[in-house]
């Protein structure tokens, strides 16, 4: 993983997010709720509002333009109110009847099946995407930007455009093109100098180099944002729909978040290799050293680009091809679609 410019901890985090997304997708497609809605209800005479699952012994009524809770983010909570009785006329006639104690006024609804597909799954995918952006920003900075630790730096010659240019020039033009490779070597020397200045006085360096500051800020924002989105996935354990979800769903959400936090913490506190050990590890002489460097450069560039292209292509194709179809088959048309 180090040859690809990715720490083992970062690779583990991407695998955990991917596994969590696959499990959530499987659970959403396989789960069958007898009643997929939960209701925020109160009695006729007024009282505390209580979220609860559907109860066959109760009569649920709703009033036009009378709701304490707005619909959630799934876009399908309205479907839970389609078959409810109108309370505008029924409540007045039922006050003096034996049905009085069984009537519940619905003040809010949640479609729990739609929540998993439209909220939980999308948050996991979004966290995966944002964390992937962070890793890409970080890899670019390891090649071109300043780093306080020289052990974090990787050779700019691993930049995939360098290899692509070399292949095109050798195959199509028939002669080697080395200007970009020489430029990247110059960039490497300049980067090392910038890293020394950055290590000596980071505040002044960031003040003098606004562009570098902006790029590093984007990297930090992507990292923090991905962590915040992962924390939001814990909402599955505290949403009103948690009444319908099995206990292992809530436990799994906590296990994933805690595991990600532990892995992130380990990546920060784990001792870094010293500069001498790092140089001794990467500087191998002779033909073996040349072959190792070339293979690492070529394979890292190809592997990282193929990884990104394949993953994003598959994600886009699946999302575009199946999302609307699955949503309609599971939940029917959304409220916005019906209005149009």
Swiss-Prot record:
Name of protein: Envelope glycoprotein K
Complex formation: Interacts (via UL20 interaction region) with protein UL20 homolog (via N-terminus); this interaction probably plays a role in the coordinate transport of protein UL20 homolog and gK to the trans-Golgi network (TGN), and is required for the cell surface expression of gK.
Ranges facing Cytoplasmic side: 136-211, 270-298
Source species: Varicella-zoster virus (strain Oka vaccine)
Gene this protein is translated from: gK
Taxon lineage: Viruses, Duplodnaviria, Heunggongvirae, Peploviricota, Herviviricetes
Topology in membrane: Multi-pass membrane protein
Domain of life: Viruses
Topological domains annotated Extracellular: 22-114, 233-248, 320-340
Cell location: Host cell membrane; Host endosome membrane; Host Golgi apparatus membrane
Entry function: Glycoprotein that probably modulates membrane fusion events during secondary envelopment of cytoplasmic capsids that bud into specific trans-Golgi network (TGN)-derived membranes. Also plays a role, together with gB, in virus-induced cell-to-cell fusion (syncytia formation), which is extensive during VZV infection in cultured cells.
Residues passing through the membrane, by range: 115-135, 212-232, 249-269, 299-319
One of the protein's GO biological processes: fusion of viral membrane with host outer nuclear membrane
Keyword check for Zinc: no
UniProt KW ATP-binding keyword: no
InterPro entries, alphabetized: GK
Keywords, alphabetical: Glycoprotein, Host cell membrane, Host endosome, Host Golgi apparatus, Host membrane, Membrane, Signal, Syncytium formation induced by viral infection, Transmembrane, Transmembrane helix, Viral primary envelope fusion with host outer nuclear membrane, Viral release from host cell
Gene Ontology cellular component terms for the protein in this record: host cell endosome membrane; host cell Golgi membrane; host cell plasma membrane; membrane
Signal sequence segment: 1-21
């Amino acid at each position: 993983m180090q040859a690809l410019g990715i720490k083992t901890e970062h690779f583990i985090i991407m695998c955990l997010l991917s596994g969590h997304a696959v499990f959530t997708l499987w659970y959403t497609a396989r789960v069958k709720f007898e009643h997929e809605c939960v209701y925020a209800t109160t009695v006729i005479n007024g009282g505390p509002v209580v979220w609860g699952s559907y109860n066959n012994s109760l009569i649920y009524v709703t009033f036009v333009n009378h709701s304490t809770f707005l619909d959630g983010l799934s876009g399908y909570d309205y479907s839970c109110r389609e078959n409810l009785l109108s309370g505008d006329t029924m409540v007045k006639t039922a006050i003096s009847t034996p049905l009085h104690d069984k009537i519940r006024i619905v003040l809010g609804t949640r479609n729990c099946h739609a929540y998993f597909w439209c909220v939980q799954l999308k948050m996991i995918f979004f966290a995966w995407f944002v964390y992937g952006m962070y890793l890409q920003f970080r890899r670019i900075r390891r090649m071109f930007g300043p780093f306080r630790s020289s052990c974090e730096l990787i050779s700019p010659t691993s930049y995939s455009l360098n290899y692509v240019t070399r292949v095109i020039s050798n195959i199509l033009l028939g002669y080697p093109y080395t200007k970009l490779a020489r430029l990247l070597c110059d960039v490497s020397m300049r980067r090392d100098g910038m890293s020394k200045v950055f290590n000596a006085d980071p505040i002044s360096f960031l003040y003098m180099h606004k562009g570098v500051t902006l790029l590093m800020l984007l990297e930090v924002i992507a990292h923090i944002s991905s962590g915040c989105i992962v924390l939001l996935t814990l909402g599955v354990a505290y949403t009103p729909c948690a009444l319908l979800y099995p206990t292992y769903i809530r436990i799994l959400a906590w296990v994933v978040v805690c595991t990600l936090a532990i892995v992130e913490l380990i990546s920060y506190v784990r001792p870094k290799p010293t500069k001498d050990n790092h140089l001794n590890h990467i500087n191998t002489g002779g033909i073996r050293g040349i072959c190792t460097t070339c293979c690492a450069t070529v394979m890292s560039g190809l592997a990282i680009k193929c990884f990104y292209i394949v993953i994003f292509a598959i994600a886009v194709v699946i999302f575009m091809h199946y999302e609307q179809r699955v949503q309609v088959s599971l939940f029917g048309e959304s409220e916005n679609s019906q209005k149009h």
